[in-house]
Amino acid sequence: MRYAIMVTGPAYGAQQASSALQFAHALLNEGHELISVFFYREGVYNANLLTSPAGDEYDLVRAWQKLNTQHGVALNICVAAALRRGIIDDTEADRLGLPSANLQPGFTLSGLGALAEASLTCDRVVQF
């Protein structure tokens, strides 16, 4: 089956993102296809390059990046939610006159259209 995941919780302080990542790995291990992960609302914090967890904590941001690198899963974050929360790529930093970007490599700023497209092309969309 083809899946898409929507994550609405931050990397730390809530369970949604961690559960979503575990679910993603379970899908792939069972031979399912994971088309994309869409990060919305507080979920956009999963794409913050500047996140620095304590040494004894799991690095969820880099784990999402590894999922993208190893399995080619698209990691889309809602551009409107990201801008409101200070997550920007180089293009937006230039456009807004900000000194630098902080979007973790492997993540892409996108609109809700990416979620709609995934909904149309997948068998299941699961929200965390």
Curated annotation (Swiss-Prot):
Enzyme Commission number(s): 2.8.1.-
GO molecular function, one term: sulfurtransferase activity
BP-aspect Gene Ontology terms: tRNA wobble position uridine thiolation
Gene3D superfamilies: DsrEFH-like
Enzyme class: transferase
Family annotation (InterPro entries): DsrEFH-like (IPR027396), Sulphur_relay_DsrE/F-like (IPR003787), Sulphur_relay_TusD/DsrE (IPR017463)
Subcellular location: Cytoplasm
Entry-linked Pfam families: DsrE
Entry's Gene Ontology cellular component terms: sulfurtransferase complex
Keywords, ordered alphabetically: Cytoplasm, Transferase, tRNA processing
Classification via PANTHER family: PROTEIN YCHN (PTHR34874), SULFURTRANSFERASE TUSD (PTHR34874:SF3)
Oligomer status and interactors: Heterohexamer, formed by a dimer of trimers. The hexameric TusBCD complex contains 2 copies each of TusB, TusC and TusD. The TusBCD complex interacts with TusE.
Function comment: Part of a sulfur-relay system required for 2-thiolation of 5-methylaminomethyl-2-thiouridine (mnm(5)s(2)U) at tRNA wobble positions. Accepts sulfur from TusA and transfers it in turn to TusE.
Name by which UniProt lists this protein: Sulfurtransferase TusD
Originating organism: Salmonella arizonae (strain ATCC BAA-731 / CDC346-86 / RSK2980)
Gene name as annotated: tusD
